[in-house]
Design a protein with these regions (language model features):
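A short, exposed loop/beta-hairpin motif centered on an aromatic-Gly-Thr core
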Residues: 32-46
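A broad, low-specificity signal for short, low-complexity segments enriched in glycine/proline
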Residues: 1, 27-28, 66
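A short, charged, amphipathic alpha-helix used as a generic interaction element across diverse proteins
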Residues: 42-63
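Short aromatic-glycine-(Arg/Gly/Cys) micro-motifs in beta-strand/loop hairpins
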Residues: 12-36, 53
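Intrinsically disordered, low-complexity charged/polar segments
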Residues: 67-71
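N-terminal acidic leader/helix
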Residues: 1-14
C-alpha cells in the first residue's frame, strides 16, 4: 500500500511493505527531498499506531492527504 501527501508542490510518499516472515512490516517514508527512511514493525497494531501518528503530524504541518494507491 502506498500513500502520497502534498504540500506546496512537494510530495511525501509512505509505503507499507508486508514482509514474508510472519506478521512483520516495513514502513518506508520518502521525504520531499528524496531521502528515505525505514521503520520496522513486528505486528500490524504497532504499524497502525505509527501510521496514524504520522498522519496527524503531517496534517498539522499542512500536508494534504493521504492519497492512496494499492498495487
Amino acid at each position: 500500500m502506498i500513500w502520497f501527501y502534498a504540500k506546496q508542490g512537494h510530495h511525501l510518499r509512505c509505503e507499507i511493505r508486508h514482509l514474508t516472515d510472519g506478521d512483520q512490516f516495513d514502513l518506508v517514508i520518502t521525504d520531499a527531498d528524496g531521502s528515505e527512511r525505514v521503520e520496522h514493525f513486528s505486528d500490524s497494531a504497532s504499524l497502525t499506531r505509527r501510521t496514524l501518528q504520522l498522519e496527524a503530524e503531517w496534517f498539522h504541518q499542512g500536508w494534504d492527504g493521504p492519497f492512496g494507491r494499492e498495487y
